[in-house]
Amino acid sequence: EEGNPEFIEQQIGQILRRADLQTKLHGKDVLPLSGEYTADVVVKGLVDFLSQNKPGGIDLEKLLDQAASMETAKDNAINALEEKLPARPPGFCTGCPERPVFSAIKLLKEEVGDIHISADIGCHAFGTFEPFSMGNSILGYGMSLASAAGVRQIQKKRTISIMGDGGFWHNGLQSGVLSTIFNKGDAILIIMQNGYSSATGQQFIPSSINMNNEQTASNQIEKALKSVGVKWMKTVRTYSVDVMLKTLREAMETNYDGLKVIIADGECMLARQRRIKKTNAKRLAEGQKVAIPRFGVDEEICTGDHSCIRLSGCPSLTIKPTSDPLRVD
C-alpha cells in the first residue's frame, strides 16, 4: 500500500483486534512510508519480512541468495554499459492523439500570452511535463472544470480546463459541466475523447466504440452535453493542429460568455493498434493486401529549426549531424 497514512493496514488491524485475533500484521515496518513501490523495493520488503518471521516451508537461505543474485545481475548490466542511459521521463506514447492538442495550446499561448490551465488525472496529465509544461492544478479525476471555478474570477483571460472522456463520465459531467452551466460560468473545456480510460489500460467507458466499431448513440458525449444545456460545442480531430488552433482561438475570442466545449476526437493509438492488428492479420490470412503507412522527415524540406521537438516533443525523431552549413543538424 503506497503512501502514508497506511489506510488499509490500519483498517485491517482494527478488524483483527475487534475480532480478538492476535495475528501479526506487517506493512510499513518492512516497506517505506513514501515513494513508489518498484520491484526492487518490494523484493527488499519481502526479504526483510521473511528474515524477521522465518515462516516454515521456505528455504530462506536460497531466497536470500536469489535476491542477492538479482542485485548482482542488475549491477553487472549497469557496468556493462559504456555510458549511463539517458533519463526517460514519463510522457505521451508514440502517436498519442493528445500530444497535438497540447501543441495547439502552446501555439495559442504564443499568441495570447499565459493562460490558466486546469489539468486532470489521465494520460493528458503528461502535458504538465516538457516541452508543454501546462497545468496549473490537478485536483481530482474529472475535477478540472470544477477546480477552475475557484480561480476563474481573478483571471484576465478565459481559463482552459482539460479532462478525458473517462474523467468526464466519472465526475466531470456532474461536478464540472452541470455546475458551470448552473452558475453561468464563462470557461473553456477540452474533452480528450480517445474512447477509453487509457491511462489505466484502455478500459471501456460509456462512450467507447463497440465490437462492431460503432459508438452507442445513447452514450455519446455530444448528446450528454446538449442534454444539460451546452450551447457552444465543437468537435475537432486531434491531429488537425491548425483546425484545433483556430477553434481554440475562436473559443478565447467569442462574445458568447457561457461554457465552451471542444471535443478533441482521436482514438487511443495503443488501443487502435491492437484493434487493427487483428483485422490486418485476418485480411492477410485471406490473401488480401494490407498497406501499412510509414512516416519520415523529408531532408530536402526540413529547415532544422526543431519545431517538431519544441512544439510536440516528438518521440520518434533521432537527431544526427548534417553536412549542410545552413542547418544545425
Please give the residue ranges for each predicted region.
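Active-site diphosphate/adenylate-binding microenvironment
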Residues: 63-145, 154
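Hydrophobic alpha-helical scaffolding
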Residues: 2, 6, 28-40, 86, ...
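Short beta-strand segments
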Residues: 1-2, 63, 118-120, 162, ...
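Gly-rich Lys/Arg/Thr-decorated short loops/hinges at beta-loop-alpha junctions or inter-strand turns
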Residues: 23, 80-89, 125-134, 157, ...
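Terminal amphipathic helices with adjacent charged low-complexity linkers/tails
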Residues: 1-68, 260, 264-267, 271, ...
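Thiamine diphosphate
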Residues: 128-261, 269-275, 281
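Iron-sulfur cluster-binding cysteine motifs and their immediate structural context
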Residues: 272-273, 303-329
